[in-house]
């Protein structure tokens, strides 16, 4: 009987040879240790028992290549224990290996008379060993890996039809520690053929990321372990940040950190740093590509870090390598001189050729030349003055003064730029020679009062620095200071001193002196102010009486000064004491009150980060896996271990590579905001990493993620008390923010995070950045994006965000929580939502929502923001509801979720209308009166049972009209239920 089964099984194997002899190409991250299909000749595995158990069979494929298989089919005999052991397999450093088994198995039901002995499974075992010395199978040494069952088994019919039913199973085992291992297959009574056995391990293959090469890395021992690998920069590159990656258990590289940059003279191409081509260059180690040599420059070798300037062209010291080479300018044009006595005005035009630069300036060279030989010139010296300046002129004119009269001067105007010093040439200048005229003397530099009496002042002065000829006389002008030159006197003298007499005692006078030559008067000197005495100077200090008088007067003056000073000090002390008291009182009143500080008000945004966020060493952080992608980069989970503290789970936001300064500032601004908050219902900031890359924000880890997704996942699983508890936590956090004068602007269930204890915490403080990437945002008429469905009408219309607008958003969050994460306003468009709110519509109560909670929602949705409750009042209301669970009884409607009709607070009271016509007129829908009458809806009792399909059936197809009518219908239904006592009033 067994021989027949072998024959059948052997015949069936010919039908599957095509499936197992295809090209054996395995993934790059799998390293094969054993492949039975690749063995040339017999496998020679050890079987126990040697006879009657496993049997090696060779079959030929269509290319006449033998395939070695093992089969066994002892299904007629009970208590089978047939073992087959492989040769010793070296593990090559792998800690976890994988076994891929391809096999066929006979369906026991297709074999007659074997129901008690036939099995459809076999067992897989392994045994570790440091050497290949085991010649026999010792069953006790082997550890079981798994029991292998077939997904598909074949029958006699399949054999006849040559239908292939090949099973493939993969198992893994680890961690392994010895040099090698054996595999064993135990048959317990199945009809089975091992078509192929492949043993392999996984590795993260050699790869290049961010110009860093990461070697082949064998995966870790656990199926969830990550192996940190440091990369090495490719040739011709250097580290910018330490390149690291994590090798995952599946053989895939994860979370690249850091990067390398191509050296100067090299650029990245296909993951390599290749030398710049001839004619190209790269000056620095950056991620930029090689650039073509700028104009008037060249490179003659590969890998150039700069380009050489053409002959006659230069590059200034502060010129970047990317700037063109330039040359000095040509000479200025059209030099014109204008001589005025001993001053000269020069004007000229810009050079015809600027040399390719914009930093042109002009220098003036002055030379004084002899009359007999103009070629013998010498510098003018420091006595000559230039307006506005002599060198570095940005204008094309200069005024030169304080020259000597009747003297020959040569003036050179040089045009210079940033490269003139490399090639000074006379071609850059233009000159002119002039002769000064006869000139008046210069002003007198120093005038002194030698003696002052009651009625006179004795003056003396120096000769002008440049007399420009023979001084004929000096003129002294003086006047009383109070007259301010309205009435003055003139005294002339040939000497350089004079006595001015006939003055008034104790009077201030102002004196001016000027010189005159044959060319005329020079300028007056600077004013000299002198005050005449009250008594003759000889009286003061002569005799005892004068001494007593002087002491008495001096003492009186001192006494008056002391009294005045004492009074002033007393007043100041009084004011200071009062001001100090007020300041102390103000400080006392403000003690303990914290106010939110906007980080964008800091001139240096980094200062806000340093002030409000704690810097964490990157070595304290271990990234475990990526859990999402945010606006600025990846969001990961990981662990934080600060020295002296226990290790905690954290969430890690990373800033993606290639960020701009603005993106970095916006990214860290959220940390500057979070760092100011300390409340159990506000997400807690652990710290930031800014001193290395990637830049990271570290916060506490919230296991259950965002509130909206969490509620949808757990629809209907919580009690009303639990839901109200969540709302209470959110309200408490918002009260804290409101007390700190912080306006959130984007309060929604998606921005509330939930931890493992169902504690809800407010997060996402990035609304100060416009919500460009928020899928719920929509353009408003004033530009920018805001989440329409959660935003108060005044914030939509006027962008007026306050704590009251946050209260409106909180009402929407209440509705989201009680509806288990439904989308507010369902599938209505944003424009329809805005229009409906403007018309007074509000969201209906979710299914099973207590009346008290929906009423609180309606309070939050008051049109006038001053009518909305404060967050403190909201928290108090929720506390009362939690303490009084009877107030949270269900509403009358529990059959289904409400339809898409919105509630209209302006709907008429049911008691105020008596007919369908009155009702339609009250809600301004009387145009449909005939539709209702024709369809038989003639009483209000019939109307309250209508649905949206009923309205469409009677010809009301406009969605907005359907919503308005259904809103009023629902309001009437609620009023009827209240009148019949089916709802508990709060």
Swiss-Prot record:
Designated name of the protein:
Ephrin type-A receptor 4
Q: What are the binding positions for ATP in this chain?
A: 627-635, 653
Q: Which gene encodes it?
A: Epha4
Q: How does it assemble?
A: Heterotetramer upon binding of the ligand. The heterotetramer is composed of an ephrin dimer and a receptor dimer. Oligomerization is probably required to induce biological responses. Interacts (phosphorylated at position Tyr-602) with FYN. Interacts (via PDZ motif) with SIPA1L1 (via PDZ domain); controls neuronal morphology through regulation of the RAP1 (RAP1A or RAP1B) and RAP2 (RAP2A, RAP2B or RAP2C) GTPases. Interacts with CDK5, CDK5R1 and NGEF; upon activation by EFNA1 induces NGEF phosphorylation by the kinase CDK5.
* Leading EC class: transferase
Give start and end of each Fibronectin type-III domain.
328-439, 440-537
Catalyzed chemical reaction(s): L-tyrosyl-[protein] + ATP = O-phospho-L-tyrosyl-[protein] + ADP + H(+)
Q: Which residues form a coiled coil?
A: none
- How far does the signal peptide extend, from start to end residue? 1-19
Query: What's its job?
Result: Receptor tyrosine kinase which binds membrane-bound ephrin family ligands residing on adjacent cells, leading to contact-dependent bidirectional signaling into neighboring cells. The signaling pathway downstream of the receptor is referred to as forward signaling while the signaling pathway downstream of the ephrin ligand is referred to as reverse signaling. Highly promiscuous, it has the unique property among Eph receptors to bind and to be physiologically activated by both GPI-anchored ephrin-A and transmembrane ephrin-B ligands including EFNA1 and EFNB3.
The effect of residue 635 to M is: Kinase dead; loss of autophosphorylation and loss of CHN1 phosphorylation. No effect on interaction with NGEF
Homology family: Belongs to the protein kinase superfamily. Tyr protein kinase family. Ephrin receptor subfamily.
Q: Which residues form the Eph LBD domain?
A: 30-209
């Amino acid at each position: 009987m067994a021989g027949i089964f072998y024959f059948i099984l052997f015949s069936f194997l010919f039908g599957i040879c095509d499936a197992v002899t295809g090209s054996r190409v395995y993934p790059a991250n799998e390293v094969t240790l054993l492949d039975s299909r690749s063995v040339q000749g017999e496998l020679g595995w050890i079987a126990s028992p040697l006879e009657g158990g496993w049997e090696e069979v060779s079959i030929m494929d269509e290319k006449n290549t033998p395939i070695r298989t093992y089969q066994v089919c002892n299904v007629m005999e009970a208590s089978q224990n047939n073992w087959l052991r492989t040769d010793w397999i070296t593990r090559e450093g792998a800690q976890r290996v994988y076994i891929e088994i391809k096999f066929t198995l006979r369906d026991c039901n297709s074999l007659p008379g074997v129901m008690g002995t036939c099995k459809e499974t076999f067992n897989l075992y392994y045994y570790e060993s440091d050497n290949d010395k085991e010649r026999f199978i010792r069953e006790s040494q082997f550890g079981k890996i798994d029991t292998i069952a077939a997904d598909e088994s074949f029958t006699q019919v399949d054999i006849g039809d040559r239908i292939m039913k090949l099973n493939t199973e993969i198992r893994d085992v680890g961690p392994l520690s010895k040099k090698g291992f054996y595999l064993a297959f135990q048959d317990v009574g199945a009809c089975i053929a091992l078509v192929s056995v492949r043993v392999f391990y996984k590795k993260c293959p050699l790869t290049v990321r961010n110009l860093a090469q990461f070697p082949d890395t064998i995966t870790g021992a656990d199926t969830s372990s990550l192996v940190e690998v440091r990369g090495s920069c490719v040739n011709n590159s250097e580290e910018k940040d330490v390149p690291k990656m994590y090798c995952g258990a599946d053989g895939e590289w994860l979370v690249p950190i850091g990067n390398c940059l191509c050296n100067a003279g090299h650029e990245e191409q296909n993951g390599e740093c290749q030398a710049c081509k001839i004619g190209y260059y790269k000056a620095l180690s950056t991620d930029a590509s090689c650039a073509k040599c700028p104009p008037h420059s060249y490179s003659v070798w590969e890998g150039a870090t700069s380009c050489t300037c053409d002959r006659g062209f230069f590059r200034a010291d502060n010129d970047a390598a990317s700037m063109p080479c330039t040359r000095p300018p040509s000479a200025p044009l059209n030099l014109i001189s204008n001589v005025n006595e001993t001053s000269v005005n020069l004007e000229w035009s810009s050079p015809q050729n600027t040399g390719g630069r914009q930093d042109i300036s002009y220098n003036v060279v002055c030379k004084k030349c002899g009359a007999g030989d103009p070629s013998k010139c010498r510098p003018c010296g420091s006595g000559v003055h230039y307006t506005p300046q002599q060198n570095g002129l940005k204008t094309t004119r200069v005024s030169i003064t304080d020259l000597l009269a009747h003297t020959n001067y040569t003036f050179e105007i040089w045009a210079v730029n940033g490269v003139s010093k490399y090639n000074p040439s006379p071609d850059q200048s233009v000159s002119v020679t002039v002769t000064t005229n006869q000139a008046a003397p210069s002003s007198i530099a120093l005038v002194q009062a030698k003696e002052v009496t009651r009625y006179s002042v004795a003056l003396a002065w120096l000769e002008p620095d440049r007399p420009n000829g023979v001084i004929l006389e000096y003129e002294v002008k003086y006047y009383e200071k109070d007259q301010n030159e309205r009435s003055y006197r003139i005294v002339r003298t040939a000497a350089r001193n004079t006595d001015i007499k006939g003055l008034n005692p104790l009077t201030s006078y102002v004196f001016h002196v000027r010189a005159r030559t044959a060319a005329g008067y020079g300028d007056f000197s600077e004013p000299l102010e002198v005050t005449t005495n009250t008594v003759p100077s000889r009286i003061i200090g002569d005799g005892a009486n004068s001494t007593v008088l002087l002491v008495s007067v001096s003492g009186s003056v001192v006494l008056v000064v002391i009294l005045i000073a004492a009074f002033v000090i007393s007043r100041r002390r009084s004011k200071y004491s009062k001001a100090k008291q007020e300041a102390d009182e103000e400080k006392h009143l403000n003690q303990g009150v914290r106010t939110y500080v906007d980080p964008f008000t800091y001139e240096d945004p980094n200062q806000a980060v340093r002030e409000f966020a704690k810097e964490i060493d990157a070595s304290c952080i271990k990234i475990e896996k990526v859990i999402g992608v945010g606006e600025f980069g990846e969001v990961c989970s990981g662990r934080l271990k600060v020295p002296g503290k226990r290790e905690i789970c954290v969430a890690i936001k990373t800033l993606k590579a290639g960020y701009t300064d603005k993106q970095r500032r916006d990214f860290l601004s959220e940390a500057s905001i979070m760092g100011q908050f300390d409340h159990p219902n506000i997400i807690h900031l652990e710290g930031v990493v800014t001193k290395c890359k990637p830049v990271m924000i570290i916060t506490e880890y919230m296991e259950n993620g965002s509130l909206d997704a969490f509620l949808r996942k757990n629809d209907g699983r919580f009690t009303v008390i639990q839901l109200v508890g969540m709302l209470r936590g959110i309200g408490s956090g918002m009260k804290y923010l409101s007390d700190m004068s912080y306006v959130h602007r984007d309060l929604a269930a998606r921005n509330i995070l939930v931890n493992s204890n169902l504690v809800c915490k407010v997060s996402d403080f990035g609304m100060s950045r416009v919500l460009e990437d928020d899928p719920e945002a929509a353009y408003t008429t004033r530009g920018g994006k805001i989440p329409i469905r959660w935003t108060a009408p005044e914030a939509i219309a006027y962008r007026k965000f306050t704590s009251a607008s946050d209260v409106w958003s909180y009402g929407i969050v209440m509705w989201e929580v009680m509806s288990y994460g439904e989308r507010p306003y369902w599938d209505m468009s944003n424009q329809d939502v805005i229009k409906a709110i403007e018309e007074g519509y509000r969201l209906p109560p979710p299914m099973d929502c207590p009346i008290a909670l929906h009423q609180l929602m309606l309070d939050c949705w008051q049109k006038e923001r001053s009518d909305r409750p404060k967050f403190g009042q909201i928290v108090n209301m929720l506390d009362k509801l939690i303490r009084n669970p009877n107030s949270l009884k269900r509403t009358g409607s529990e059959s289904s979720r409400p339809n898409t009709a919105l509630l209209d607070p302006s709907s008429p009271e049911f008691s105020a209308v008596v007919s369908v016509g009155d009702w339609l007129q009250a809600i301004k829908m009387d145009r449909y009166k005939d539709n209702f009458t024709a369809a038989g809806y003639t009483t209000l009792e019939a109307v309250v049972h209508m649905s949206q399909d009923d309205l469409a059936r009677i010809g009301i197809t406009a969605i907005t009209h359907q919503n308005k009518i259904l809103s009023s219908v629902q309001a009437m239904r609620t009023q009827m239920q209240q009148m019949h006592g089916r709802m508990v009033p709060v």
